[in-house]
């Protein structure tokens, strides 16, 4: 029996076990940096499987498992993120979230379950492994600021790693389909804040004020013009203003207005140009109307997620032995898995969960997001298959 058939047979034995783990985590979701029960479940499960476990790697809720092979070889890292989102779940699932205002709306519950399933398969087939398989259960991917990957890396989780792989469940692809690409696959997210300082006054006499709301509207229109006017329209790039705050009463023109939003890009030159254009636009428009301004960008954001071309080519061939594989366009979401890929070559890929018959049609981060659980065994199988193959390179 070849490797693929052996692992397929083994994963059938634990399909229900993987689903039950996922449901338990889904019922009790935990926000970034607070994944206490989730990380406890992970550590306990790994120990029961006979996996060497280290807790608190870089962050209190981080867990790392190590499976050592029967002979020398490569070190392969597999990663799953664990945190949930501040979303009130709006589904009829029997195992829907029991935590008010918190939901696994991005599928990280499935990521944990699939990697635990992969751990089971790898322990059972330890004789096929060379080197070391490192299982990274990461907190705080959804933080969007520091994120959980950076402190784990600083604590040494990637030391000696030769290859690294990660899976993300996605409703953008049909159930059971793997999707990835060579090179940039996810964007850098530059969060920004623009503050316009004007001069307030009575709503009946706007000519006596420097109206920060009016000025903010001019800035917003001009900023949206950066796309396809200053930046090549064939480049994957977007600017979105997502919050505008100003004022307290209908007859008062306020002193200040604040806007926040995000820039998403895959290319460092495009990113730099966009930020420069934004600063110039804000400064110029505020100057015209006599206002002052501040433009702030979040520091140390997630880098662009860049798949190694050679490794990804091989990954696509390997995954095609267990399901359909498609080459996807870049996604303008962001991921701190990008930090792991800066330390070792590897591949980040999606596993489709869209299934109209089961009502799994809502996007990630939706309050109605649901997952076709039939795909979870595929994720576990993919983890194990890639680990065995690349540990023996």
UniProtKB/Swiss-Prot annotation:
Pfam families: M20_dimer, Peptidase_M20. Its cofactor is Zn(2+). CDD domains: M20_Acy1_YhaA-like (cd08021). One of its GO terms (biological process) is proteolysis. It is an enzyme of class 3 (hydrolase). The keyword Signal does not apply. Its EC number is 3.4.17.-. Zn(2+) binds at residues 104, 109, 245. One of its GO terms (molecular function) is carboxypeptidase activity. PANTHER family: METALLOPEPTIDASE, PUTATIVE (AFU_ORTHOLOGUE AFUA_6G09600)-RELATED, PEPTIDASE M20 FAMILY MEMBER. Homotetramer. Can release basic, acidic, aromatic, and, to a lesser extent, aliphatic amino acids. Belongs to the peptidase M20 family. This is Thermostable carboxypeptidase 1. It comes from Saccharolobus solfataricus (strain ATCC 35092 / DSM 1617 / JCM 11322 / P2) (Sulfolobus solfataricus).
